[in-house]
Amino acid sequence: MTSNKALETLLEMCEESNASDLHLAVGLPPRFRIKGSLVPRDDLRAFDAADVEAVAMELGRAAVPLGGDEGVERVREVLLREKSIDGAVTSSSGVRYRFNVYRASDACAVALRRLDSRFRSFAELGVPERIEAFSDERDGLFIVTGPTGSGKSTTLATMIDIINHKRDGHIITIEDPIEYIHKSDRCVVHQREVGRDAKGFNEALVEALRQDPDVILVGEVRELETMRTALRAAETGHLVFTTLHAGDCVGAIERLIAVFPPDEQNSARRQLSLVLRGVTAQHLLPREDGGRVPACELLVNTMASANHIATGHSAQIYSVIETGGNNGMVTLDQSLERLVRSGAVSLRTALGIARYPPQLKQRLGVV
């Protein structure tokens, strides 16, 4: 079987079994994540090093686009130097996948994530519908945070889709890789992939400010200069969306500020307090009936929270969220409480990520 055929067969199996993820490792049969559990298929043999490498090279050529043997050698060269390669591919049935090819135990390994083929509403995703209101903002910064695999990209893709269909403007996305494809509707949408269409996140963001955008999506802000440029874009009339890796909204704010040198952090806090529109933190949890469900925290940046951000009293922001239900705000623990009461997740699961486990148990009447 050719490497292309092997890859296509595996992707078909993902779709047939409604798997969210596929993992390839030397010495093991392919494993599929179904309803949150990583399971093998009885009809597939263990993959040897050549099997895994063949699929890895086929995927790698999608991220390092050169044809024939030259393409394979280029993939090997990049993998040897960088130790991993990110990218995205589309199956013959039109389903899009994000992948990471990486080195492990001196061999190739592969992780693929199946992406939704259609855009869902926030209600369908199970995240606070109040988030949709941020699509009406004309400028400022909105952050989606959470661990890897928590649905951050899906939430932002839904936001971009909503804006694309309800207002006129120019949307620029800067991604690595491009995961969801947006077709221009009321908006003109340009999607730029780092490495293919742009040199880097900051370079693309600087260039975007010369391209008359209304909305900018930055897949992830990792470096100081990118953060500076994103804040400048947000305060000069652009609506900026991005992601960070943090467990909650307060953690995201602190992580953003920590990127700046100590002598710049006070001014960064003041700048952020003015441009921030909101932060949502997401965690995907196993459902009691199978599958996964999001627990979400949401901060809407009010005058009270803006003052706490500006003065460095980040711990007080949690109280603003806790008492901000009238503005659509919700803490992670409040979200967990609702999920436990509805029977969607177990108490044990909720306590595992709760900010204040004893208080959560008390509210649920658990001794």
Feature roles, as predicted:
Residues 1-367:
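Short, flexible helix-loop junctions that flank or precede catalytic/ligand sites
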